[in-house]
Amino acid sequence: MRRTIAVRTMTEPETFPRNAFWETRAFALAMIALAAIPLLFTPIPPLTDLMGHMGRYRVQLEIGSSPYLSHYYRFDWALIGNLGVDLLVELLGPILGLEPAVHLIVMAIPCIMVAGLLLLAREIHGRVPPTAIFALPLAYGYPFQFGFINFALAMGLMLIAFAFWLRMARLGKLKWRPHIFFVVSFLLWVAHTFAWGTLGLLCFIAEVVRRRKEGKPWFESGWRAVVACLPLAPPALLLMPWRGGSSPKGTFDWFNWYFKWIWLRSVLRERIELWDRLSALLLYAIALSGLLWKPWRRYEPVLGIGALLLVIVFVCLPRVLLSSAYADMRLVPTMLAILILALRPIGGRRLSISIAIAATLFFVARIAITTLAFQKFERNYDTQLQALEHIPMGARVMALTNTPCRSAWYSSRMEHLSSMATVRKQAFVNDQWEAPGAQLLRIAYPPAGRYYSHDPSQIVRRPDCRARNEPILEIALEYFPRDAYDYVWMIDMPRNRWPVDADFEPVWTGNRYGILYKIRHHAPQPGPVMGQNGAAGR
């Protein structure tokens, strides 16, 4: 039986030392375990949007049994390409509880990404180049830190799937590959559409390169690659019914070079600006180092061409695509990681060992700083969340969160901390997203009005740097529908901005930052009817 030629460029023997420490299974497992450490001791992972997702998960899990949540929200299951973590929460939430389940799932995402990067590097080169270790910190890239957990999970799984695609070709097991990847393509599409599209792009390139290595002409290589990738195509049929009813306004802000530049330099954005920028600069320097001398020899063609096409996709993508914000930003860590993985090793044993040690120390340093940063975020969360002790079940909470300007590198990551009132108290909070076609939750509480019922009505920045759809504090306090809410929760708000209002009764203060007010009402309110035992009745 004829064996298929591998898509792989083996490295010269003298380039790699035998039994190199970074190629052992123990090293790979250590790197995967290391990726979990920053999230190990943070019960609420400090990712900007995550708490908002957790509020949605609470509605998802309990809307059928909670009179509070069913009064404020609607949740209808549908097949959309953005459900990776949602489905895992549906599986694990009833077993572990919502918060432990989310903690476990989110902690696994960087581990999956690191595993995918190492597997792909080994499969594409035959052995793990020492430079590949420099890609590992991108498991904590800005999209993950922002809380795009469905996207991050799906991209990690995509890397593993692509490595498996290459492995099956190398081993000549092409008979079963279409059947396996027919299923894989649907799973990836459901996890996140971007991952499915990226897998298709990389698999097509791999098939073209493989045919060219077999001596086939370009045209034949191209159409054979199309045929090989057809099992990945069926999820495209789901795009029409999924997005068919979306508003045309769901895609906009094309070729915004200002933001694209910000995304490039923010690839490792976390807390300490100088450290994060220097780290990003180092990764870009390593990724582009292959251009200095015979780039056609320094870059492995499958990943090199793949990274180039992802750069083109990044340039062409709008900032908001089909109601999904920051569409272009999400690709930056992936395209940078793939370009780093594309580098073929050069030099002798001593240089390879030196690069591997330097890369490992860099990853350890990034993990250490991230761990300390996450601990600081967690302590700040704990201080503000003390207010929840004074909020009853099913309350209606108007959140106003003090938020730094977008230009500030450091962010408190509290934009959606108020959703913990939904998670722990089944409360209505004005911080959920309205994104038809992108998620399944709907706000069904008309008394809150069109603006003060959803994100970003909770985000309060300085007037000179706020977005046009974000509130001005004084105006929000004056005009939000007071009869629709029971509490005003001013998260991380400095004392000099606390209002003095006859209708606001302070019930908790966080020393210098944060205050919770109970609203004094003068008429019956439209919330759930309370029984004598405090339980809500229908």
PLM regions with names:
Residues G55-E62, Y73-L98:
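Short hydrophobic/aromatic helix or loop-helix immediately within or flanking a transmembrane segment
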Residues R461-R538:
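Aromatic/acidic, Gly/Pro-rich catalytic loop(s) in extracytoplasmic/lumenal soluble domains
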Residues V364-L388:
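Hydrophobic alpha-helical transmembrane segments in integral membrane proteins
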Residues F377, A387-I472, L477-M493:
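Short periplasmic/luminal acceptor-recognition loop of GT-C membrane glycosyltransferases, typified by
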Residues T42-H53, G64-S66, Y73, G81-N82, ...:
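Transmembrane catalytic cores of multi-pass membrane glycosyltransferases
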Residues M31-I37, C111-I124, P129-A169, R177-E207, ...:
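Membrane-embedded helix bundles of polyisoprenyl
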Residues L283, L341, P345-T370:
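Signature aromatic-anchored transmembrane alpha helix within multi-pass, membrane-resident enzymes
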Residues L322-R349:
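Hydrophobic/aromatic-rich transmembrane helices and adjacent perimembrane loops
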